[in-house]
Amino acid sequence: MARPALLGELLVLLLWTATVGQVAAATEVQPPVTNLSVSVENLCTIIWTWSPPEGASPNCTLRYFSHFDDQQDKKIAPETHRKEELPLDEKICLQVGSQCSANESEKPSPLVKKCISPPEGDPESAVTELKCIWHNLSYMKCSWLPGRNTSPDTHYTLYYWYSSLEKSRQCENIYREGQHIACSFKLTKVEPSFEHQNVQIMVKDNAGKIRPSCKIVSLTSYVKPDPPHIKHLLLKNGALLVQWKNPQNFRSRCLTYEVEVNNTQTDRHNILEVEEDKCQNSESDRNMEGTSCFQLPGVLADAVYTVRVRVKTNKLCFDDNKLWSDWSEAQSIGKEQNSTFYTTMLLTIPVFVAVAVIILLFYLKRLKIIIFPPIPDPGKIFKEMFGDQNDDTLHWKKYDIYEKQSKEETDSVVLIENLKKAAP
């Protein structure tokens, strides 16, 4: 009986000793790591490696604490390396220390720092506004603007890499879009988890005169689907039913939809967001794989409806939900009353009204004499009898009754007498 009790006490003593040793090791500050180095793989993969500290406590299960200079991305792990995909646009420094637990509150060893400098070259020569969009999960298109201190005849080269590639590849299809320069390359899903990877992009020139630019593109961001295809439009029971085919490579639950509905009776552009499938009673083949539908109630019977649809990714499957696809090709349905008849009527009615008004004016002028004949005025008779003289007087009043004297003229008068002879 004494031997089992002795063994139990010995086991407890050993456990207590180990615990005390671990606690002592945990509270003890460990030596710093050694041989810290940094290197670059692929295009933008930075790898820091180091060796365990010399003289570490034997009871310590080493963990390594690391973070960047801005105290971001703190990490505690047992590995003696750290790998990150980072753009090489500026100086990047990592600090590493050792400790005996994964507790962040534990004080690590003195930190050792190692930095990597940005690529050589004038920062103003690097390309700007470098962005990449994954189109319909089929190809990636990257575009950029030339740097400020760049020659107009610079020939650019774009390289890309992702984990499924053994080495980086060069994009061959470089072209211009206005002021932007762009390049497209095929990029499809190669494995189920491919969407959760990153693509490393680097743009530089053939002559090595500009600073290379590196960008890390997450495949769950900046995804732009192709426009959907409208399959059916149906007017039934005062409602408009719309069914469309979703773009390939996407599951319906990973997309958000917008439907634009316009009609000839109003000038409003109605854009409606589709939150759920509302075509429960649709007679079309709505259960076909990759199709979605929408129902708009309260449509007008005498109007033509024009419909367009567009889609974007949602955050159920992707990190980004801002890039809408282009609008689908518009399709119309409905019957409108004969607009030619109304147009003709609108043009002819004013002409008829104008002609009728002119005829009526002439007719009223003659009709006035018949309806309103002149009334005899007895006073006019006396006015004519007694008023003529006054009128004549007034008429002659404006004339001068005295004639102006003309100039006197004097003529000589010769008297000729005819003398008769006296009788003898």
UniProtKB/Swiss-Prot annotation:
Pfam families: Il13Ra_Ig (PF18001), IL6Ra-bind (PF09240)
Entry GO terms, CC: membrane
Residue pairs linked by disulfide bridges in the UniProt entry: C44-C93, C132-C142, C171-C183
Principal location: membrane
The keyword Ribosomal protein is assigned to this record: no
Similarity comment: Belongs to the type I cytokine receptor family. Type 5 subfamily.
GO molecular function, one term: cytokine receptor activity
Positions of glycan attachment: N35, N59, N103, N136, N262, N338
Tissue specificity annotation: Spleen, liver, thymus, heart, lung, kidney, testis, stomach, brain, skin, and colon; but not skeletal muscle.
Domain notes from UniProt: The WSXWS motif appears to be necessary for proper protein folding and thereby efficient intracellular transport and cell-surface receptor binding. The box 1 motif is required for JAK interaction and/or activation.
PANTHER family reported in the protein's UniProt record: CYTOKINE RECEPTOR (PTHR23037), INTERLEUKIN 5 RECEPTOR SUBUNIT ALPHA (PTHR23037:SF46)
UniProt keyword annotation of Membrane present: yes
Signal peptide (from-to): 1-25
Motif (Box 1 motif): 371-379
Name of the protein in its database record: Interleukin-13 receptor subunit alpha-1
Transmembrane segments: 341-364
Extracellular face residues: 26-340
Membrane topology recorded in Swiss-Prot or TrEMBL: Single-pass type I membrane protein
Domain of life: Eukaryota
Subunit structure, as described in the record: Interleukin-13 receptor is a complex of IL4R, IL13RA1, and possibly other components. Interacts with TRAF3IP1. Interacts with IL4.
